[in-house]
Structure formats: structure tokens, C-alpha cells
Amino acid sequence: MADESKFEQVKGNVKETAGNVMDNKDLEQEGKEDKASGKAKEVTENAKDKVNDFIDKLKK
């Protein structure tokens, strides 16, 4: 799952850069949204992993 969120961030960065270079504000905005979505997924995944680790420690 982490790979998917990183890929989404990279894809967003490429779109944002391409939109900036081509002066395409829609593509640039779409890239920013993809980056933000990927980052949010990454943060959520990290939090979920920490909660699961904590639960595993409680079980021991």
C-alpha cells in the first residue's frame, strides 16, 4: 500500500510540473490534488501501522 501512495505522490508531482511548464492550470491543479491525496494515504497508512504495532505489543 505504501508503494501506491508514493506512486500517487510522484504522479502528482509529474502532472504539477508538466502543467506548470505547459501553463496548463487544470493539469497543475490535478497534480497538486494527486500529491495531497497520496500524502494523506501515506499518513493514514503510517498511523494504522503504529496502531497495529501498539495492539501487537499489548497482546504480548
Swiss-Prot record:
Source organism per UniProt: Staphylococcus saprophyticus subsp. saprophyticus (strain ATCC 15305 / DSM 20229 / NCIMB 8711 / NCTC 7292 / S-41)
Family annotation (Gene3D superfamilies): YjbJ
Coiled-coil intervals: none
Family: Belongs to the UPF0337 (CsbD) family.
Name this protein carries in UniProt: UPF0337 protein SSP1897
Renumbered residue ranges of the record's region Disordered: 1-60
Matching InterPro entries: CsbD (IPR008462), YjbJ_sf (IPR036629)
Biased composition range(s): Basic and acidic residues: 23-60
